[in-house]
């Protein structure tokens, strides 16, 4: 039997709550390691030595390997020729590929979602938008980039985009969308930090509001066009950040 632990709910920090849940040790390590990858605790391409991970997250090598293999399936880490693991590198080409694939998947899912939309779907979407707006205000008001605020913002951001396509009635589309979201999150989070530092002008809140308005109006064509433009603008910001000289990007 796999060892189990009591751990804070995955969304507890984002919600400001203190709930706990019973999960396997492997699941706990997976969540902690994935969170740290998203927060930039490990550099792209960095080797992940099992002993160092054991010291950082606890447990034996077996649940650590389980967590790493799960992250490998999500393309967060890659294997090396010596059967080790390292953080997956970041590249403009991969980011663009993920972005364009995400547009194909999410725009199709959005059109289907709007065709099936009802009052309950609209209520969830409006609620997700307001929760996202609140999280964005808290994150922007913080005197410095705060990991907990950024985690909460990312959780609310994902929930809004999930709500948009939530009525598509296709588990495959929803699953593929979630995978692609995770891939773009790896790029988007460090890019947000750099964009804040260098003052890239973009009102993402207005983009989300326009998406909400088009979706609530059941205007599938406009909503899909806005979603594609939203993703491509994000890709352009990320590409500019990745193209900065190494020293400047790390400043």
Name each model-derived stretch.
Residues 119-190, 207-214, 222-234:
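Conserved amphipathic alpha-helical segments that form helical-bundle/coiled-coil interaction surfaces
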Residues 45-46, 80, 173-177, 193, ...:
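Short, hydrophobic secondary-structure boundary micro-motifs
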């Amino acid at each position: 039997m796999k060892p189990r632990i009591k751990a804070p709910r995955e969304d507890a920090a984002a919600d400001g709550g203190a709930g706990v849940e019973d999960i396997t040790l492997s699941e706990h390590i997976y969540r902690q390691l994935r969170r740290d990858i998203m927060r930039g605790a490990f550099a792209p391409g960095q080797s992940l030595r099992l002993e160092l991970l054991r010291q950082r997250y606890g447990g034996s090598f077996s649940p650590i390997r389980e967590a790493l293999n799960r992250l490998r399936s999500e393309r967060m880490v890659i294997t090396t020729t010596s059967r080790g693991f390292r953080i997956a590198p970041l590249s403009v080409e991969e980011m663009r590929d993920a972005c364009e694939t995400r547009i194909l998947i999410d725009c199709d899912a959005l059109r289907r979602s709007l065709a099936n939309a009802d009052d309950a779907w609209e209520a969830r979407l409006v609620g997700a938008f307001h929760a996202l707006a609140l999280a964005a205000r808290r994150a922007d008001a913080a005197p410095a980039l705060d990991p907990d605020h950024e985690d909460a913002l990312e959780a609310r951001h994902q929930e809004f985009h999930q709500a948009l396509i939530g009525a598509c009635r296709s588990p495959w589309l929803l699953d593929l969308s979630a995978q692609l979201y995770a891939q773009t999150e790896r790029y988007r989070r460090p890019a947000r930090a750099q964009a804040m530092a260098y003052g890239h002008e973009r009102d993402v809140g207005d983009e989300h509001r326009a998406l909400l308005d088009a979706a609530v109006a059941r205007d599938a064509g406009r909503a899909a066009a806005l979603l594609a433009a939203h993703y491509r603008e994000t890709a352009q910001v990320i590409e500019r950040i990745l193209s900065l000289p190494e020293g400047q990007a790390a400043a």
